[in-house]
Amino acid sequence: MQKLKQQVFEANMDLPRYGLVTFTWGNVSAIDRERGLVVIKPSGVAYETMKADDMVVVDMSGKVVEGEYRPSSDTATHLELYRRYPSLGGIVHTHSTHATAWAQAGLAIPALGTTHADYFFGDIPCTRGLSEEEVQGEYELNTGKVIIETLGDAEPLHTPGIVVYQHGPFAWGKDAHDAVHNAVVMEEVAKMAWIARSINPQLNHIDSFLMNKHFMRKHGPNAYYGQK
């Protein structure tokens, strides 16, 4: 698991590097599906002092199997998403400013241009709010459940992120670094959408044919963007 712990450590260290977190906020995880184990950031440990060996290994029930620290308080959310969506290899949660602002406003991040469409096939959805019972109960588990309720059976890698109402963004990808990459993009397109709607409050969504073109040329069966 040492290689995966190193990858998760590096991905977590990318969060302050890209301005996605403040203090000890945020967490990144990755899963080893063959072993049924997840590596995740320890709870409340400062990025400045964190080391790869500080990463915590848990099984799919959340039991710590390796590590000196408690795992992230959001571990149950990560595990619920891994259980539901086999294509996920890494998950990240941040409180990045603009994506969190959309979450606090209770609004999906609208697909307004090609930058958004290069990564997200449509709006980045916002979940419903959790009930008092859901918050007072198994809060982190129920956060995962409301994300799944919102995504449904859609392929999560086609919309690799979501904003949780009054909370903040979660993003995911094929591995930990891909998840962080998508979180960075989500923050950028959230900022772009806010600026664009400030300039033109009547601004409509990107044309569907343009969105389809940009997403499919990077992610479709006949994708031709980049090098092979």
Curated annotation (Swiss-Prot):
Pathway: Cofactor degradation; L-ascorbate degradation; D-xylulose 5-phosphate from L-ascorbate: step 4/4. Induction: Induced by L-ascorbate. Repressed by UlaR. Substrate binds at residues 26-27, 43-44, 72-73. Its EC number is 5.1.3.4. Its cofactor is Zn(2+). Keywords: Carbohydrate metabolism, Isomerase, Metal-binding, Zinc. GO terms for biological process: L-ascorbic acid catabolic process; pentose catabolic process. The active site is at 118 (proton donor/acceptor), 225 (proton donor/acceptor). It is an enzyme of class 5 (isomerase). InterPro entries: Aldolase_class_II_sugar_metab, Aldolase_II/adducin_N, Aldolase_II/adducin_N_sf, UlaF. It catalyses: L-ribulose 5-phosphate = D-xylulose 5-phosphate. Catalyzes the isomerization of L-ribulose 5-phosphate to D-xylulose 5-phosphate. Is involved in the anaerobic L-ascorbate utilization. This is L-ribulose-5-phosphate 4-epimerase UlaF. It comes from Escherichia coli O6:H1 (strain CFT073 / ATCC 700928 / UPEC). The lineage of its organism: Bacteria, Pseudomonadati, Pseudomonadota, Gammaproteobacteria, Enterobacterales. The gene is ulaF.
